[in-house]
Amino acid sequence: MTRPRVKSYFIDYSLKKVMLDEFLANYFKDAGYAGMELYKTPTGYRVVIYAEYPGRIIGRGGSIIRKLMTIMQTHFGLENVNITVSPVPDPDLNARIVAFRIVRALEKEIPYRRVAMAMLRRVMEAGAVGAEIIISGKLRSERARYEKLKAGRIYKAGDMVDYVVDRAVGKALLKRGVYGVEVVIVRPHLKPPDYVEIKSVKPEELADLIPVEKEETNESISPQ
């Protein structure tokens, strides 16, 4: 009898988390929203919001936070919610922040290729292993197409996708229509599975590793 309740609990919890994440992404797009975490505590819920500009989410004197707490209680059913806003340590390595930057630039009628090249260069200068930016829509004509720019190494499958690859999508509303933006960033990591390191050996170390063959000398035997 308890299994259906446990299953429905986790389904409701996941749906609530996804809906809250989409709401915060649309509401705080200009604040550099980077993601959120939802925790269940003994007294209620705890929400941690990550953003590039935390002050735009907190508001003057916490006014926006208080409104946000009311919205979470009435529309999402989060009773006794505690909200924490944390800054992002590396905004240039966060795919969602980069995608929102591209969206804001496109909505200002900045050429898409210039925006993509500038953001790609900025991500790689921040230390990313690889990055890929895809912009789709009516870019040059009435027919929809896409433009893909990438640099470095991109992982499409395997365990590395779950650990070091960050992906985000966004959409920009223009007069010509809707532009889709997809950003993939491979964050810096220690060693990938296909990493091969060739060590340099000093000459004196090489002499110790390779045995030196001694030349045999033929001693002449003098007759008695």
Swiss-Prot record:
Residues 20-89 form the KH type-2 domain. InterPro entries: KH_dom, KH_dom-like_a/b, KH_dom_type_2, KH_sf_prok-type, Ribosomal_S3_C_sf, Ribosomal_uS3_arc, Ribosomal_uS3_C, Ribosomal_uS3_euk/arc. It holds the Pfam family KH_2. The keyword Ribonucleoprotein applies. GO terms for cellular component: cytosolic small ribosomal subunit. One of its GO terms (molecular function) is rRNA binding. Gene3D superfamilies: 3.30.300.20, Ribosomal protein S3, C-terminal domain. Keywords: Ribonucleoprotein, Ribosomal protein, RNA-binding, rRNA-binding. One of its GO terms (biological process) is translation. SMART domains: KH. Disulfide bonds: none annotated. The keyword Ribonucleoprotein applies. Belongs to the universal ribosomal protein uS3 family. NCBIfam families: PRK04191.1, uS3_euk_arch. Part of the 30S ribosomal subunit. Binds the lower part of the 30S subunit head. HAMAP family: Ribosomal_uS3_A. This is Small ribosomal subunit protein uS3. It comes from Staphylothermus marinus (strain ATCC 43588 / DSM 3639 / JCM 9404 / F1). The lineage of its organism: Archaea, Thermoproteota, Thermoprotei, Desulfurococcales, Desulfurococcaceae.
